[in-house]
Each structure stands twice: as structure tokens, then as C-alpha cells.
Amino acid sequence: MSTGNFDLNELKRRMQGATQALKHELGGLRTGRASASMVEPVQVEAYGSHMPLNQLATVSVPEPRLLSVQVWDRTMVKAVEKAIVDSNLGLSPATEGQVIRLRIPELNQERRKELVKVAHKYAEAARVAVRHVRRDGLDTVKKLEKNHEISEDDQERLATDIQKATDSVISEIDQLLAAKEKEILTV
């Protein structure tokens, strides 16, 4: 029972990369509920360069529909406020000293449906990435068997293991999508 030059754990790690990317993409979808990840893409013109917001301020969620941005340097408050407005996130900042409050507006039903469609696109892209990894793994196993580095039985066993890993990751992707869809549609 030799596996030749095939590493199933490496294949699983590559598949998990697709779910990690999906988690990151889904985290960026605005759901009507405040999340610090909503302002992650905001770049602030500071100290002569563009910097991520999280390098200039602490972002917290004091209420389900409110973000609080505590700017560390008083001179950067206006720049942070401008960056938030320019980011097209649909958030309007209210500044009190060094604290910028961002109220998250209600999502209408039409916008919620659009967000669900976007979430489905992200999930499908992740599924496709996992299937590509599966295909690469199966191709590698077939080549190993063709070159007589592994037996035909080992090839079949590895192909079954690859399919089990694929099914597991696809199931995880479906669970992530279902959870995000529920979060988006919950009023």
C-alpha cells in the first residue's frame, strides 16, 4: 500500500484554502448587522501613504447595528472619516472627538436578495476551486499508477480518499453559505 509521491494532506490543505477564502469573502458582505470586518477594505491617506484603517484605529461593535472607530492619533480623525465616506460602503460617520460612530442602515428585501446571490456566486467559486484541486489530485494518482509507482488498488483507494475529502469540503462550503444566507435574510 504505497502512495508514491502523493500527499493527501497537502491536497486537503489546498481544498481548505478555498473555504478560508470563502469565509473571508462572506465576512465582507454587509448583512445589516455590524461587523468589524465591514471596514477592513477601507484605506486611509495617512502619513504620506495609504494605510488600512485597522492600523490607525480600533474598530469595535458596541451594538448590533453600530460600529465604533476609536482613532489613535487625533490628527487623523478627518482623514479616517473621509476614507470611510469615500469607500462607498454606504456608511455615514458621526464624529465625537476621536471616536467615529457608524450606524448600519436597515437592508431592504431587494438588497438582501442581491446579497444572497453574491454569496451564492462566492460559494460556487469556492466549489469550483475545490473541484480543480480534486482533478489535480486524481490526475497525479493516475500518472503514478501509469508509471507503476503505485498499484491499481492503491490508485482506487486514493481516488476514494480524494472524493471523500472533496465531499467533506463541499459540505463545509454549503454550511457556510447556508449560515450566511440565514444571517442576510434575518430581519
From Swiss-Prot:
One cellular-component annotation, GO: cytosol
Entry's localization field: Cytoplasm
InterPro entries xrefs: Ribosome_recyc_fac (IPR002661), Ribosome_recyc_fac_dom (IPR023584), RRF_sf (IPR036191)
One GO biological process term: cytoplasmic translational termination
GO MF assignments: ribosomal large subunit binding
UniProt keyword list: Cytoplasm, Protein biosynthesis
Presence of keyword Heme: no
Domain of life: Bacteria
NCBIfam families according to UniProt: frr (TIGR00496)
Entry's family note: Belongs to the RRF family.
Function noted in UniProt: Responsible for the release of ribosomes from messenger RNA at the termination of protein biosynthesis. May increase the efficiency of translation by recycling ribosomes from one round of translation to another.
HAMAP family to which the protein is assigned, alphabetical: RRF
The name this protein goes by in its record: Ribosome-recycling factor
